[in-house]
UniProtKB/Swiss-Prot annotation:
GO terms for molecular function: rRNA binding; structural constituent of ribosome. This is Small ribosomal subunit protein uS8. Belongs to the universal ribosomal protein uS8 family. It comes from the Bacteria.
Length: 130
């Protein structure tokens, strides 16, 4: 059986690992997952990530906790394979009144909603994180 929504699987694995207070979580790797992990690290939501090469590349994400609680309180898929959500630069969502981020895939790469607004581009809103 093939996996239909690999990003939703990534977010579910992160949520489940944080509920179990795991230090790291591994999952099958893809270019898009690696870019999402890069944005999460850049914004301080995870400690680090590594990609192991091979026949089946794996992405290992090192989770981040603050005083025993997960830094990522909420991570949710926004645009789904069954219902894609594209937004212009002015319509990009503000997550938790600007305290969270929306991860957007644009023509200039994967970036946060703030970076997309600064670059003046819109795109597909992948997920929201706070």
């Amino acid at each position: 059986m093939s996996m239909q929504d690999t990003l939703a699987d990534m977010f579910t694995r992160i949520r489940n690992a944080q509920m179990a207070t795991k230090e790291t979580v591994t999952m099958p790797s893809s270019n898009l997952k690696t870019e999402v992990a890069r944005v999460l690290k850049q914004e301080g939501y995870i400690n680090d990530f590594t990609v192991t090469e091979g026949a089946k590349p794996q992405l290992a994400v090192t989770l981040k906790y603050f005083e025993g609680k997960p830094v990522i309180e909420h991570i949710q898929r926004f645009s789904k394979p069954s219902l894609r959500s594209y937004k212009g630069k002015d319509a990009l969502p503000k997550v938790a009144d600007g305290l969270g981020i929306a991860i957007v895939t644009t023509s200039q790469g994967v970036m946060t909603d703030r970076a997309a607004r600064q670059a003046g581009v819109g795109g597909e809103v992948i997920c929201t994180v706070f």
